[in-house]
Amino acid sequence: MVQIEQHVWGMTPEGEAIILYTMRNDKGAEVKISNFGAAIVSVTMPDREGRMADVVLGYKHPEGYFFDGAASGKSVGRCANRIAFGRMTVEGKESALEVNNGPNHLHGGTKNFANRIWESRVETNRVVMSLLSEDGDQNYPGELNVEAAFDFDDENSLEITYLARTDKTTVVNLTNHVYFNLAGEGSGSVLDHQLRLNSSQVLEMNDKQIPTGRLLDAAGTPQDFREFRPFRPGIDSEFNHIRDFKGYDHPFVIDGWKPNILGEVGCLREQTSGRCVTVLSSQPSVMIYTGNWLAGGCPETKSGGRYNDYDGVAIECQNYPDAVNHPEFPSPLLRPGETYCQKIVFRFGTFA
């Protein structure tokens, strides 16, 4: 049975309370979640010997989460990832969005959902957070009601359910930006972690980190993760701009994806600790980001230091980047009367 505790962790500059929820199961594993950014703050899991460690990145103080560039552990939206040149057309009306990442719009803008207080409550063994995004918020059309529900169980499985409804057709693509280091937060590079993905194709990217619209076969390339492989050997490859991006920062297409069906995305594992996390999602793609720009941009960490590049890997289940400008991609549009519902599941365990 999961026990949930809560306390006031801090305050925003506007005087809003930052609540920290601790979800602890019968095995002693625990997950901490904050209502600032609907964020995963820590995940404490056993290694193969039963020794506990926090396996996600995060900051020592709640203020560290204010507008951090890494969006560590936070729920981003309205639209995760990039929209080319901050331009989109919805039902014939063009919107100019904030350009906040090179020439592109990223994660819904500076004041995106990751940088706001969410209303929050406990429902039995889950924590539910909600947010109202007004019509025109960050120049997106339509009023959007958003909910993020976090469920944790005695089998060390963390499930996130994102729901959204709108009164005008709009763009929605929600994900969580948690960074994993299965050796333990603050233990250094994740480049020797091994990843397996249920993906035989990747999106071809241009040098501005926008999909060209083409799908590339991953077989025989540094982006072929159909079998477990570490990140390090491919980190300097010229394939699909890996070197240009300083590492992996790419969307992988999930094989056999069907709308509204939860399917396996893949598994991340770390040999020394024996920890692993299996990821499931109802989304059509997953962004693998090896923390290429963590150095210098993060506040004081939970372990009291500073992160270096590659100290964590984000596994971001989501729709294709820039999908609103690619009719051949799965549609990111949400219409009145429809309910956006997407799930992400992180199943933690160990291997021999």
What are these regions (language model features)?
Residues 1-352:
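An exposed, glycine/acidic-rich loop-and-rim segment of catalytic or binding clefts
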